[in-house]
Structure formats: C-alpha cells, structure tokens
Amino acid sequence: MSWQQRVDDALTARRATDTLRRRYVVSQGAGRWLVANGRQYLNFSSNDYLGLSQHPQIIRAWQQAATRFGVGSGGSGHISGYSVAHQALEEELAQWLGYPRALLFISGFAANQAVITALMKKNDRIVADRLSHASLLEAANLSPAQLRRFIHNDTQHLSRLLQSPCPGQQLVVAEGIYSMDGDSAPLAEIQQITHKHHAWLLVDDAHGIGVTGVEGRGTCWLQGMKPELLVVTFGKGFGVSGAAVLCSESVANYLLQFARHLVYSTSMPPAQAQALSASLAVIRSDEGCERREKLADLVKRFRAGVNASRFTLLNAHSAIQPLVVGDNIRALRLAEALRRRGCWVSAIRPPTVPAGTARLRLTLTQSHEACDIDRLLEVLHGAGE
C-alpha cells in the first residue's frame, strides 16, 4: 500500500461511518455569540465557562505584559524562557491549591503526556478510567508501562485491577470532570483505594478548575482530597490557554530534569503568564464567585427544562451537558437543525466517544442569559429530524 492510498483509505473510512471531522472558520467564537459566515449564533460549544476570555482586566494584563516582555518567551524555560511572570504564576498556583510546587506547560495535552512519559517505566502499570482524555490514554499506550482501563467511575473494578500483582509502580489516572460526559469522578473513594495499594493518583481537572469549589479551586478541593499529581488547564475556566502540574518539591525537580515536553519546548509567552495571574485573581474574587453561581443557576435551568424522554440526558451537573442520541447521522442532523435556528452546537461522534453514543455536547457559560437557555430548550424540542 502506498502512502497516498493509506491516507485516502483512512479518510474514506471516516466518511463511510459519518465520523469525518471538519473545522469551521469563525470570526468570533469564545463568548455568548459565535459569528460564522456573517451570521450570528447563540454559542453552546465554547469551553470559556466563566466568560473570562473577554474580561477587560485580563486583556489589559496581557497587553501591558506584551509591551514589557514582547510577544514570545524566546526559548525553553531551561535556557532563557523562564521569566518573573512565569515564576510568579507558579507560586500563586501552588499557594492557591495547597501544593509545594507548580510547573507550567504550554497545553494540557503536553502536561499529561510529559508526566506519564517521564514517570512510567517498564514493569509499571497505569490504571486509567476508560473515559480518560486522549492525551492521557495516548501517553499511557506509548509508555513502556502496562495500561489497564477500569469501567467509568467503577471503584470496585479499579480495586480489582490494582490487586493484580505488579512488579513495578502503579499510577491511577482519573479526571475531575469528564469532558464528554460532564460527570464527576468519586475522587475521594478513588484516592482511598489507590493509597490502599500503595499507588499514586493523577487527576486531570481541566474542566473543574476555576469553576467548582471554594475560590474555584476545583473538583479535588470540592471533594476534600489532594492527589499526588494534579493537572490543571487554563483554556476553560481561566479563559486563556496553557496548563500546570501541581506536585511535591521532589516530583517537580524530577520533571524539570526528565519531562521532555517541558525541557524541549518554548515556554508560554510571559504576557500569557501575566494574563493568567490576572485571571486567577478574578477567579478567587467575589466576582469569580458570582460568575460561578450564575453558571450553576443556568445549568439547573437547562436540566429542569430539557425533555428527557426524547434525549438521554447524562448525570452531569457541570457546564458540560451532553445529550446522547446514539446514531452519528442523527447527531449531525440535530446539530445542523439547531444551527439553522440560530444555536451553535457540536455533534460529537466516535472515536471521541464510544460507538453508539454520538451526542450533542452542549456547554453553558456564565456569558449566557436565562433567555438564551430558554431559546436553546425551545429549539431543541422543536428540532426536526
């Protein structure tokens, strides 16, 4: 088989199963409104949960820092790319979340890959929730460690897998809030089982940090537990981009030596780090609390109004509200019907979600108003198929 045939066959297979992804060009897409092809839509696909991507205080912080530092970091943090802005943000994050250290990464994908590839060795075992993010599962598959996956949020299955003899170390992997189902993991119970078997726990709280818990400290804080490794990302609740790993002093020093995604990547711009510090200040403030409360009220309004007899509404009380419709074509047609009526919604299909669970992934944000939720419900219940 030639290279071209391999490429063509893969694309043909995606088209045949209605799983071919496409990108849309938008002129505005993070906030309440999405604008594409000159038309304005109510936006129910954004991860900007607290509406901070448009916050004037955060925008101003980035602009001022860009004037001071320039628009790029100039290199890896191990060479010349670790500025006072990076250092300040790491210290603020560590203090906020109660860890000795925080290390910044350019993305959540990079952070997850870096931690797993740096830590896991031959004879080790990774025990991950089946619905863990692609960045975690890909890193686990590429590592020399054995990967076992437990049934989603099934702590009994997790316990059985950990009981199996392992000559090396074991790492349990879970998420605070799952990106496609919107539900939370029973983290306190998972941690108890993990420690019983002398393993470590990694929690990716990309969709919980900033949005849940006191001062937005996230899902782990809300459940009263602290994993050995906490990954937080900044493209959702923070409204910016990037990520950080929270850990012990010794693990931070280890990652600085052996995490290749950190050592060999240009660090985020100092202006981005300063904008993230400004975002953190808003998240921790009374304004941040008000934004979280408004978002929670909007989620309740949506769940109370949706017609559960027509859609499978998952047990999600986060900003992520998936409506499982099953069939790929049905999901695509529903998304298109909603767009025709002014609501921008994403149809999520395999391989992002398991076969037979295609869905509309609705995301609500603080930028929405109650009337927007009512309009979404009206359009959902009236959408033709």
Swiss-Prot record:
<feature type="binding site">
    <location>
        <begin position="108"/>
        <end position="109"/>
    </location>
    <ligand>
        <name>pyridoxal 5'-phosphate</name>
    </ligand>
</feature>
<feature type="binding site">
    <location>
        <position position="233"/>
    </location>
    <ligand>
        <name>pyridoxal 5'-phosphate</name>
    </ligand>
</feature>
<dbReference type="Pfam" id="PF00155">
    <property type="entry name" value="Aminotran_1_2"/>
</dbReference>
<feature type="modified residue" description="N6-(pyridoxal phosphate)lysine">
    <location>
        <position position="236"/>
    </location>
</feature>
<dbReference type="InterPro" id="IPR001917">
    <property type="entry name" value="Aminotrans_II_pyridoxalP_BS"/>
</dbReference>
<dbReference type="InterPro" id="IPR022834">
    <property type="entry name" value="AONS_Proteobacteria"/>
</dbReference>
<comment type="pathway">
    <text>Cofactor biosynthesis; biotin biosynthesis.</text>
</comment>
<feature type="binding site">
    <location>
        <position position="352"/>
    </location>
    <ligand>
        <name>substrate</name>
    </ligand>
</feature>
<keyword id="KW-0808">Transferase</keyword>
<dbReference type="InterPro" id="IPR015421">
    <property type="entry name" value="PyrdxlP-dep_Trfase_major"/>
</dbReference>
<dbReference type="GO" id="GO:0030170">
    <property type="term" value="F:pyridoxal phosphate binding"/>
</dbReference>
<dbReference type="InterPro" id="IPR015424">
    <property type="entry name" value="PyrdxlP-dep_Trfase"/>
</dbReference>
<keyword id="KW-0093">Biotin biosynthesis</keyword>
<protein>
    <recommendedName>
        <fullName>8-amino-7-oxononanoate synthase</fullName>
        <ecNumber>2.3.1.47</ecNumber>
    </recommendedName>
</protein>
<feature type="binding site">
    <location>
        <position position="179"/>
    </location>
    <ligand>
        <name>pyridoxal 5'-phosphate</name>
    </ligand>
</feature>
<comment type="subunit">
    <text>Homodimer.</text>
</comment>
<dbReference type="InterPro" id="IPR004839">
    <property type="entry name" value="Aminotransferase_I/II_large"/>
</dbReference>
<feature type="binding site">
    <location>
        <position position="207"/>
    </location>
    <ligand>
        <name>pyridoxal 5'-phosphate</name>
    </ligand>
</feature>
<dbReference type="InterPro" id="IPR004723">
    <property type="entry name" value="AONS_Archaea/Proteobacteria"/>
</dbReference>
<dbReference type="InterPro" id="IPR015422">
    <property type="entry name" value="PyrdxlP-dep_Trfase_small"/>
</dbReference>
<dbReference type="InterPro" id="IPR050087">
    <property type="entry name" value="AON_synthase_class-II"/>
</dbReference>
<dbReference type="GO" id="GO:0008710">
    <property type="term" value="F:8-amino-7-oxononanoate synthase activity"/>
</dbReference>
<dbReference type="GO" id="GO:0009102">
    <property type="term" value="P:biotin biosynthetic process"/>
</dbReference>
<comment type="similarity">
    <text>Belongs to the class-II pyridoxal-phosphate-dependent aminotransferase family. BioF subfamily.</text>
</comment>
<feature type="binding site">
    <location>
        <position position="133"/>
    </location>
    <ligand>
        <name>substrate</name>
    </ligand>
</feature>
<keyword id="KW-0663">Pyridoxal phosphate</keyword>
<comment type="function">
    <text>Catalyzes the decarboxylative condensation of pimeloyl-[acyl-carrier protein] and L-alanine to produce 8-amino-7-oxononanoate (AON), [acyl-carrier protein], and carbon dioxide.</text>
</comment>
<feature type="binding site">
    <location>
        <position position="21"/>
    </location>
    <ligand>
        <name>substrate</name>
    </ligand>
</feature>
